[in-house]
Amino acid sequence: METLLLDGETLTLEQVRAVATGAARAALAPAARERVRRSRALVDARLEDGEAHYGINTGFGTLAEVRIPRADLERLQRNLVLSHAAGVGAPLPLPEARALVLLRANVLAKGVSGIREHTLDLLLAMLERGVVPVVPERGSVGASGDLAPLAHLALVLIGDGEAFLAPPGAAGRPERLPGGEALRRAGLEPVVLQPKEGLALVNGTQAMAAVGTLALLRAERLAALADLAGAMTLEGLLGSHRPFAPEIQAARGQPGQIAAAAHLRALLAGSELNASHQGPGCHKVQDPYSLRCMPQVHGAARDGIDFCRGVLAREVNAATDNPLVFPDTGEIVSGGNFHGQPVALALDVLAVAASHLAAISERRVEQLVNPSLSGLPPFLAPQHGLNSGFMIAQVTSAALVSENKVLCHPASVDSIPSSAGREDHVSMGMTAALKARQVVENVRTCLAIELLVAAQALDLRAPLRPAQRVAEAHARLRERVPHLSEDRALHRDIEAVSRLVDEGALEP
């Protein structure tokens, strides 16, 4: 198993996924360890200068003017973690919680947070030994960062809260335990937080970045899969390949459109079905937009997803706590890097971009099941009337598309003041992340439905064969889901194709 060396500078989104899914380990890079030592030394030095330093020997937020006696500084950090662990709702799924731990460790590895080596080592040991904090999804407004989610992470470090014990490679369901018990079972001991450490752990954008990163990576795969689903539908509807010609795309110059059209051309190369309806005998002049404009719509989605990738690629290596500790200049400086606006905006774009993959997919399903549009039996049903075929599969897709329209209302346009007016503009970044995650999940199901329905259409076009790559995907789908010869409970078929999507088994 690959071991990633965290340095706060070079972590990639794909590496985040690898650690989140248990496919890679993480350790602290030697150079990062030295930076951590130096930043901690500066914090310790400032403790001796008699001055007020925010979050080190003062209260927090609107209580920043309150000086805390030296004897109470450890208690101050513990109280910060306890008081901020006010999250509610379902716990983050294990991959997202692991990504959260990884991202917080990577940020601390930059050496500008003032954390001790010992505390950072415990965080990485938890990741290594499968101690995964129970982190409620809700309760963050995205500034000062994701306070509540990160506080729930920090609870486990101090032997409080709850954790799943899920050692990498272990079989069975993870065990949910009190945090201290989970540490003990993993052979670890809780830490007593020193001045600045509680603040270094709870202040940052890592929850929204963790959820958003995994949603983004899934959306990227779905953008490619949308081309396959669209190509399969196009073949089933005897659609034209001509709108995907490179000169059309070059005349507009949008990079996502150019990439999507190239992918569609590759998927559709060598199609017998296409050859069967070319030439002067073809009665079609133009296909519906949901077929003809796939490069433009899928391409715009790709461009939006790419924008989100750029933001998150920077954010996973960003120092987003406050104050920041700069040992090279000897300064500890308060700022606003905890504000999640860049991530919130990017995740709203991700949701809107991905939603269009489902919206146009559902319209293609309508083309397939509507006999006046497809020339195929109504709802692709055998003995239609007695059988309803894929009638309600299209309705399910429509329901998810409409749900996405609600979810795509941007979270980042909202703000609500908190902390007695001190935190008077917030990002709602975690809300954007959770919404984007659900939108992407809905897109996956809509594409699974389209693939299922398009496969039936291809069956009905036999003996003519589709393009080779479309035929290969059709064959893989048919290994799991048989042709619909009479009505059956379609939810099982939708679930089976959705699993194929998750496994990457249909990826072109």
From Swiss-Prot:
PROSITE patterns: PAL_HISTIDASE. The keyword Cytoplasm applies. It is found in: Cytoplasm. Its main location: cytoplasm. It catalyses: L-histidine = trans-urocanate + NH4(+). Pathway: Amino-acid degradation; L-histidine degradation into L-glutamate; N-formimidoyl-L-glutamate from L-histidine: step 1/3. InterPro entries: Aromatic_Lyase (IPR001106), Fumarase/histidase_N (IPR024083), HutH (IPR005921), L-Aspartase-like (IPR008948), Phe/His_NH3-lyase_AS (IPR022313). CDD domains: PAL-HAL. There is a cross-link at residues 143-145 (5-imidazolinone (Ala-Gly)). GO terms for biological process: L-histidine catabolic process to glutamate and formamide; L-histidine catabolic process to glutamate and formate. GO terms for molecular function: histidine ammonia-lyase activity. Contains an active site 4-methylidene-imidazol-5-one (MIO), which is formed autocatalytically by cyclization and dehydration of residues Ala-Ser-Gly. The modification 2,3-didehydroalanine (Ser) is found at residue 144. Disulfide bonds: none annotated. SUPFAM superfamilies: L-aspartase-like. Keywords: Cytoplasm, Histidine metabolism, Lyase. Its EC number is 4.3.1.3. GO terms for cellular component: cytoplasm. PANTHER family: HISTIDINE AMMONIA-LYASE. HAMAP family: His_ammonia_lyase (MF_00229). Belongs to the PAL/histidase family. This is Histidine ammonia-lyase. It comes from Anaeromyxobacter dehalogenans (strain 2CP-1 / ATCC BAA-258).
